[in-house]
Regions:
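Short, hydrophobic beta-strand segments
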Residues: 2-8, 169-178, 230-238, 371-379, ...
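Conserved mixed alpha/beta core segments that line enzyme active sites in large multi-domain catalysts
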Residues: 33, 47-77, 158, 268-337
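Terminal amphipathic helices with adjacent charged low-complexity linkers/tails
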Residues: 198-223, 400-429
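A carboxyl-terminal module marker
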Residues: 2, 20-23, 27, 448-455, ...
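Mobile "lid/hinge" segments at catalytic clefts and subdomain interfaces of large enzymes
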Residues: 120-129, 133-135, 144-149, 163, ...
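Glycine/proline-enriched, intrinsically flexible loops and inter-domain linkers
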Residues: 5, 23, 53-57, 198, ...
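Phosphate-backbone binding interfaces of nucleic-acid-interacting proteins
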Residues: 1-208, 348, 371, 375, ...
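Extended, well-folded interaction surfaces typified by the phenylalanyl-tRNA synthetase beta subunit core
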Residues: 189, 422-587, 720, 772-776, ...
Length: 806
């Protein structure tokens, strides 16, 4: 937000330089992104009194003698139509820097340095300036909008710098407001912090006004959607006179980039900038029935907004309506049918608190992000709603814009506007900080923040202002204390609540790091995602009713709907990663992610969820297939010191004939498979994608196989290829296990061919294996190998009617 120094000084006596104030703000947690002097582009421009002004014959020019006080007297040629003797104008001396305009003098195009010149045979030693040449407009300084010279007041002292006179010595602080401090979205909120950090008194906001009694009171407010609008206030003003705002208000609005419109509209904008609370003003004549209704929109309902755009709404959008029709999109923009006009004579001011998540979703969905919606998205509070209304009514009276009546209406189903008690332990506050901050210093700091501290022994009793919704615990109090006590007082210390160790990685961290290094060494890239995903992801992956994957925890204040659920599985995120890669032109790749999923013990939450480590893979591209992904899983298995077993399986989101369940022993720990064609189509994938996901937590809980040293073989291995014919219902895994069970000399059984078709009967298939024998005591003679093969064939025939293909 932009905060002019002159505006801050209205509420705090600031006696330090702008640069020192910037450092002070940074020290208490507010980063000043830019600090800029309003007239930084202007230099060596002083007040000049024209003592003589003679026309140059045959031209539009005048030859002027200009008295610039201590700077001297100068001859200057000027072509402005309003130059005359006895008047004072901004005078740019030789070497001065001013704004350069285009030929039409309609906009500033840069800066220019003034040099001595010669016009029509006359020397000119400077330039008399217009408002635009000083970077001013009519709102920043009255008269600056005139195309001729800027006329200065009669009491301006010749030779004096014009910057203080024209407000060009003001400074603009562009302050980054963190998400937890919505109370600092306005000038007054920042002034509270400035007063606290400087140890100065905060001047009160002027909010008094006189009400004129009127009868009868017909204004009504009904909030039909209190979950989206916990507080709504409306107040009537009569005898309204629509006219331009005074110069001081127009200047402040202009300094922060807001255009002045008319007094009543400017008041609402001014209050938003000052307090961070958006407001709106309705033409009361357009409120049918003198009735304001806050409700959700009907499906397909229409509203024409102030920018003359027609919006088509749905029940997720919140509306402000009169007795018959919508008159505004709540928290975002008013309706064209109730705008303030030159003929407006009665106004209803609106101040409200709207649910930030609802405003954010509506603004994004409708493409209508405004200053008001930006403020509501960050958050407002019930206390500031009332304060803003009082301030707007005070300004109405101060500007003579209308008569404040005693007619108001509203509804508050939200938080109290009174201070709320909070008691914390001073020892715990200091425990968080790791230092001992004296109780007197703690109380002084918190008193400067209007928290009315009382310290009795270790008990620190506070009264938290309603606008500080972020203050909930002793950790929050500790943050406030150290912000103003000074981070430079912090010293390294051990956590008192934790066991002191020598540091380093835990055993689990070492295993996970080794696993990541192994996978990266295998040509895979690590993917890192948010811990959230979208409800649409779960729907796309067709998880069955009752599935653990569907028991996702909804985030109360999500970044967006696409990131509104805590992840219960990683596979949807990996599929989306493939989609993003292919959209960016990367059509092949091997990705893995090691991250936690969050499984609630019960919904709604009654306890912390189980956090389980999962490992997921996504292979995509023309060179990838089921077996390249299986190889990656085998690589992971070796790193984890386990053996994976694979069985044909079905997942709701994979190809029915290219999916396997992954087991360790008899415990299923995951799956691998080819992403189903229809899901790949929904994601607009241009190649096949293969996914896998393993539950590392379950693997960790299983007994790991012991690793023994095996000496190098003394005798050569022997291999035999067997092409076997069997029923189609028999799985490869069954055959491998049968073969392995025939002899301890069998080291490996590897499938290398699958065949179906003539001359194999239609109900049978052929699987070809390479069987590797490793003798331990003596070399295998051919007849020994033949005997082992016959033993295998006999076991296969008797067990599963599997025969050798001939």
């Amino acid at each position: 937000m932009i905060a002019p120094l002159s505006w801050l000084r209205e509420y705090v006596d600031i006696d330090c330089t702008p640069q020192e104030l910037e450092e002070k703000l940074f020290s208490c947690g507010f980063e000043v992104e830019t600090l800029e002097e309003v007239g930084a582009h202007i230099s060596r421009v002083v007040v000049g009194l024209v003592t003589s002004c003679e026309p140059i014959e045959g031209t539009h020019l005048h030859l002027c003698e200009v008295d610039c006080g201590s700077e001297g007297k100068f001859q200057i040629c000027c072509g402005a139509d309003n130059v005359e003797a006895g008047r004072k104008f901004p005078t740019a001396l030789i070497g001065a820097t001013v704004c350069e305009t285009n030929k039409e003098r309609s906009e500033i195009v840069g800066t220019v340095t003034i040099q001595a010149g010669r016009l029509r045979g006359y020397d000119s030693f400077g330039m008399l300036c217009s408002g635009m040449e000083l970077g001013l407009n009519e709102d920043l300084y009255p008269g600056a909008g005139y195309n001729g010279l800027l006329v200065l007041p009669d009491d301006a002292v010749p030779g004096a710098d014009v910057k203080p006179l024209l407000g060009l010595d003001d400074w603009l602080f562009d302050i980054a407001i963190t998400a937890n401090r919505p109370d600092c979205q306005g000038i007054y909120g920042i002034s509270r912090e400035v007063a606290a950090v400087l140890g100065k008194e905060l001047k009160p906001l002027l909010v008094s006004y006189r009400e004129e009694k009127v009868a009868p009171h017909t204004l009504k407010v009904d909030v039909e959607a209190p979950q989206y609008c916990p507080r709504y206030e409306a107040h009537a003003v009569k005898d309204v006179k629509i006219q331009p705002s005074p110069a001081w208000m127009r200047r402040r609005l202009s300094l922060v980039g807001v255009s002045a419109i008319s007094n009543m509209v400017d008041i609402t904008n001014y209050v938003m900038l000052e307090l961070g609370q958006p407001m709106h003003a309705f033409d009361r004549r357009d409120l049918i029935g003198d009735h304001i209704v806050v409700r959700t929109a009907a499906e397909g309902e229409k509203l024409v907004t102030l920018d003359e755009q027609t919006l088509t709404l749905n029940p997720s959008n919140l509306l402000i309506c009169d007795g018959e029709k919508p008159v505004g999109l709540a928290g975002i923009m008013g309706g064209l049918n109730s705008e303030i006009k030159e003929t407006t004579t009665a106004v209803v001011f609106e101040a409200a608190k709207f649910a930030r998540d609802n405003i954010r979703r509506s603004a994004r969905a409708l493409g209508k992000r405004t200053d008001a919606s930006a403020h509501f998205e960050k958050g407002t509070d019930e206390y500031t709603v009332e304060l803003a209304m009082q301030r707007a009514l005070h300004l109405t009276e101060e500007l003579g814009a209308g008569t404040v009546t005693d007619e108001s209406a509203g509804q508050n189903t939200g938080n109290s506007i009174e201070k709320r008690p909070l008691t914390v332990s001073l020892a715990r506050v200091n425990g968080v900080l790791g230092i001992e901050v004296p109780g007197e210093a703690v109380c002084r700091i918190l008193a400067n923040l209007a928290m009315e501290p009382e310290l009795e022994g270790d008990a620190l009793r506070l009264k938290i202002p309603a606008y500080r919704e972020d203050m909930e615990s002793y950790q929050d109090v500790a943050e406030e204390v150290i912000r103003f006590y000074g981070y430079e007082h912090l010293v390294p210390s051990f956590l008192k609540s934790a066991e002191v160790t020598s540091g380093g990685l835990s055993e689990r961290q070492r295993r996970e790091l080794k696993l990541k290094e192994t996978l990266a060494g295998g040509g895979m890239y690590e993917a890192i995602h948010y811990s959230f995903f979208s409800p649409a992801d779960l729907k796309l992956f067709r998880y069955p009713e009752g599935s653990e994957a569907l028991r996702a925890i909804r985030i109360l204040n999500p970044i967006s709907e696409e990131l509104s659920l805590m992840r219960t599985v990683l596979s949807p995120s990996m599929a989306n990663a493939v989609m993003r890669n292919q959209k960016a032109g990367n059509l092949s790749g091997r990705l893995f992610e090691l991250a936690k999923v969050f499984i609630p013990k019960a919904l709604p939450l009654t306890d912390y969820p189980d956090e389980r480590a999962h490992l997921a893979f996504a292979f995509f591209g023309k060179e990838e297939n089921f077996f390249t992904l299986k190889g990656a899983l085998d690589l992971a298995a070796r790193s984890l010191h386990v053996k994976f077993r694979y069985e044909a399986s079905i997942e709701p989101f994979t190809h029915p004939y290219q999916t396997a369940a992954v087991y360790v022993g008899n415990v299923k720990i995951g799956y691998l498979g080819k992403l189903a064609y229809d899901i790949a189509g929904e994601l607009n994938l241009r190649t096949d994608a293969y996914l896998a996901e393993l539950d590392l937590e379950t693997i960790e809980s299983l007994p790991h196989e012991q690793v023994y040293f095996t000496p190098l073989p003394k005798f050569p291995e022997v291999q035999r290829d067997l092409a076997l014919v069997m029923a189609k219902s028999i799985s490869c895994d069954q055959v491998v296990n049968l073969i392995r069970s025939c002899s301890p000399l069998i080291r490996e059984v590897k499938l290398f061919d699958i065949y179906e078709g003539a001359p194999i009967p239609p109900d049978r298939k052929s699987l070809a294996f390479t069987v590797t024998f490793r003798p331990e005591e003596k070399a295998l003679a051919p007849e020994d190998t033949d005997a082992l093969v016959q033993q295998i064939l006999e076991r296969l025939r008797t067990s599963c009617d599997i025969v050798l293909r001939v």
